Amino acid sequence: MKDFHDVYNSTLNEKEELPTLFCDMDMVLVDFLKGADKEVGQSFVKMDNAKRWATIHKNKTFWENLDWMPGAKRLWSFVNKYGSHILSAYSTKDSNCVPGKMKWLRKNLKLTQRSRIHLVRRSQKQDFAMTNNKPNVLIDDHAKNIKEWKSKGGIGIHHLSVSTTLNELKKLGYK
């Protein structure tokens, strides 16, 4: 029969063995499209590529002032208990993107630990799928990122809503 310490230690070990979480920003935590549509005055995705990015670039504080996605504070509160990392792609079309995202993280998540913030090119996200031959978990709204992550051995959660993402995390052992 297991005593209290056996149960306690096995619980600790289970928690320690959970994969590292990586959470995307745009359209998971941050409502990029709502902010972009507002900034360009029409549908960002339907607008000419060069014009839309030129408009975004003119607003130096665009990235740092984006709104939270609905329910994203609840998602962050859950994943942050496990020391979740941020893994977000930056745009090469706007030099304000990286500093703006850093300001958003500092202001909204109070996240300043550079070791937990990874702003990379989209194609580089998959490079974080494994650590020491152990899979990590990516929460991302972009199906291509999830596919690439899984192909590198990671565990991908295609973010469609906060409730489905939280359910997937719970299935993986996050409480």
Q: Which role fits each region the language model picked out?
A:
Residues 48, 57-86, 94-99:
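Short, acidic loop-to-helix structural element flanking the phosphoryl-transfer center
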Residues 1-19, 68, 78, 103, ...:
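Charge-dense, intrinsically disordered terminal/linker segments
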Residues 3, 7, 11-60, 151, ...:
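Active-site neighborhood of HAD-like aspartate-dependent phosphohydrolases
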Residues 134-171:
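Acidic, Mg2+-coordinating phosphoryl-transfer loop and its flanking beta/alpha structural elements
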Residues 20, 117-144:
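Conserved Lys-Pro-Asp/Glu-containing loop-to-beta segment of HAD-superfamily phosphomonoesterases
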Residues 85-95, 102, 106-127:
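A short, structured active-site edge motif that brings together acidic residues
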Residues 29-33, 38, 84-86, 93-97, ...:
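Short catalytic/ligand-binding loop motif for oxyanion handling, primarily in non-cytosolic enzymes
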